[in-house]
Design a protein with these regions (language model features):
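Extracellular/periplasmic catalytic domains that process cell-envelope and extracellular macromolecules
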Residues: 278-280, 311, 349-351, 358-359, ...
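N-terminal secretory signal peptides that target proteins for export/translocation
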Residues: 1-17
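Serine-dependent carboxylesterase/thioesterase catalytic core
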Residues: 74-81, 90, 94-106, 111, ...
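Hydrophobic helical h-region of N-terminal Sec-dependent signal peptides
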Residues: 22-30
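C-terminal subdomain of alpha/beta-hydrolase-fold enzymes, centered on the catalytic histidine
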Residues: 440-567
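Flexible, membrane-associating and regulatory peripheral segments of lipid-active enzymes
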Residues: 34-285, 294-300, 316
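Short, solvent-exposed loop/turn elements at domain surfaces
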Residues: 295-296, 328, 423-426, 507-513, ...
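Short amphipathic alpha-helix adjacent to the substrate-entry channel of hydrolases
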Residues: 299-315
Length: 567
């Protein structure tokens, strides 16, 4: 009997354990949108070209256009030297006046192909000194210390993720170097700095008995052209490919879970990271993720922006990462601080005083603090006395910044994606309580609250806020429960600038009545909470709390951004 009872207890405990783990797994699944981001690989192509002992090439400058075209057509493609001759021939042809469409298309295509065949094996060897082939020496204009990936060497595993190439001439690639953490590198991803690069023919000349081929290798941050004779050709470059190679190397997605359950461990990675070079002439777009998430959720949207030449030339993309277990208002204060730091160090970035904010789920709550004027409403919802009656120490003013803030920019465009403006019912469910129990708040946050409350006294907390301040502060899940005072107050604050909403649904995609709208729910946030009265326009898309990757929502965001470029 005792054995049976013991076995029964074991089975009961095991069942309870499995149920709890199942709830945790469900919570994690519902609250996040993370997935594997390994979608490309790199092929290392070895040259199949043979080499000659003696290289020589004719002077094509005085050859008539049509004769030169026929000569280029007749050249071989078997050896490295053949490819150099073809490159020199097409280079001369591209400088001729009045090329036919067929001649120009041929010349550009063969120029690019021959150059790619020449440099691909050289880059694979990662040698920065001249490469010697008999009496032919090949070198690059700039000795770039880092890794280079040619676009022809990128093997895409996910056909939905593609990159556009802007331009027509030269070989496009990606240059990658380590992040030095110095200067502007402090605002770039820690995984490294990834930039588009273009290769083109610099010069081919004979020095004594030797031939020297020099190849221009230029990092392109915007469209540039190459003058050849009286003709101008735009150089190939691909901002989206640089981002894809960065994402393939990124490890920030490994901090989604850690950032939620133990935010202190992930705090070192907190920041705002510019995907491209900081640019005073481009409007920043800040993309902010939600609970148990990371910046890689913005993969498809970021690619769409980088693949659109007009939008790429108008906007610069910044990704925010924050450990999501800490409450959103604390995280918002930290992100505002980082944002203002960037703008203070680079005042030119703020010359238009215009910003775009795109937030998913709780990230929308974080972003909302960037575009609202709080006055003392959030403070009054928390404390019974005004700041000037409570603030005494320098650390107290850090506390004030959590509750009192102004819009960062004068002009704003806000996109709220699956955002629980009134909280999420799942945060109040058993799943939410289990998720909340997993979170260990960081000492930095707890110490800030503890020292302040111990000094002013818990009696200075409002009755509504008091339950949330047990153990010196709520975590993010507790803050997102419907009825939280700060979320309610923030929901009523006017948003400065234009507002758009993207709402997810696992069922119907539109609603005309209150009863119908109750059916719109993405599994985490319902329509009532996701709907924002201040939105100029909202759309409902098929989504399980992952509208950030929905094609309809991406098209909607891009369309609104294009409208903004016309203003």
């Amino acid at each position: 009997m005792l054995g049976s009872k013991a076995n029964g207890i074991k089975l009961y405990v095991l069942s309870r354990f499995k149920s709890k783990m199942l709830m945790i797994i469900i919570f994690v699944f519902l609250a996040s949108g993370c997935s594997s981001y390994k979608f490309l690989s790199f092929k290392k192509k070895q040259s199949k070209l043979s080499t000659e002992k003696i290289f020589s090439v004719a002077d094509f400058s005085n050859t008539a256009k049509d004769d030169l075209y026929q000569l280029c057509l007749s050249l071989g493609r078997e050896t490295l030297e053949d490819m150099v001759r073809l490159l020199a021939c097409t280079n001369a042809l591209l400088a001729k006046d009045a090329l036919s469409h067929q001649q120009q298309k041929f010349a550009i295509t063969e120029y690019n192909l021959s150059l790619n065949e020449i440099i691909s094996p050289l880059l694979n060897n990662k040698q920065h000194t001249p490469h010697n082939f008999g009496n032919l020496s090949i070198s690059f204009d700039t000795d770039l210390q880092g890794d280079i990936y040619l676009l022809s060497d990128l093997l895409m595993h996910d056909q939905e993720l593609q990159f556009s190439v802007f331009g027509e001439l030269g070989v496009a690639g990606v240059f990658a170097r380590k992040n030095t953490a110095q200067g502007n590198d402090a605002y770039y991803p820690l995984e490294g700095v990834y930039r588009p690069i273009n290769f083109s023919l610099s010069e081919l000349r004979k020095v004594g008995s030797k031939w020297q081929l020099k190849i221009a290798n230029e990092i392109l941050l915007q469209q540039k052209s190459k003058i050849m004779g009286k003709n101008k050709y735009s150089l190939n470059y691909s901002p989206a490919s640089a981002y894809l190679v960065l994402v393939e190397q990124a490890d920030i997605d490994q901090l989604s879970w850690t950032g939620m359950i133990n935010p202190g461990e992930a705090d070192a990675r907190r920041g705002i990271f510019a995907i491209e070079e900081l640019n005073d002439n481009k409007t920043p777009i800040l993309m902010t993720h939600g609970l148990n998430s990371d910046p890689l959720i913005w993969l498809k949207l970021t690619l769409a922006l980088l693949n659109d030449r007009e939008l790429h030339d108008t906007f610069q993309i910044w990704h925010a990462y924050y450990p999501s277990g800490s409450p959103p208002f604390y995280n918002a204060m930290m992100i505002r601080k980082r944002l203002k730091n960037i703008l203070s160090k680079h005042p030119g970035l703020n010359k238009k005083s215009k910003g775009v904010f795109i937030g998913h789920s709780m990230g929308g709550i974080v972003n909302k603090t960037m575009v609202t004027s709080s006055g003392y409403q959030l403070w009054d919802a928390t404390y019974t006395l005004k700041p000037d009656e409570l603030l005494q120490q320098s650390s107290d003013y850090e506390m004030e910044k959590i509750f009192v803030f102004e819009p960062v920019f004068e002009k704003n465009i806000s996109f709220f994606v699956d955002t629980p403006h009134k909280g999420s019912n799942i945060a109040s469910s058993l799943v939410g309580y289990l998720g909340s129990a997993l979170i260990t708040l960081p000492d930095k946050f707890l110490d800030l609250n503890r020292s302040f409350i111990n000094r002013i006294g818990a009696d200075k907390l409002t009755l509504r806020m008091l339950p949330y301040m047990q153990n010196f502060g709520p975590n993010s899940v507790q803050t997102m429960r419907p009825g939280h005072p700060l979320v309610e107050v923030l929901d009523e604050l006017p948003i400065h600038g234009k507002v758009y909403s993207v709402i997810g649904s696992q069922s119907i995609l539109s609603c005309q009545s209150e009863q119908q709208c109750l059916e719109v729910n993405d599994g985490v946030v319902d329509y009532i909470s996701a709907h924002n009265q201040q939105a100029e326009e909202e759309i409902v898309v098929s989504s399980s709390h992952d509208s950030y990757k929905n094609e309809k929502s991406i098209s909607f965001i891009l369309a609104k951004l294009r409208e903004a470029t016309l203003e």
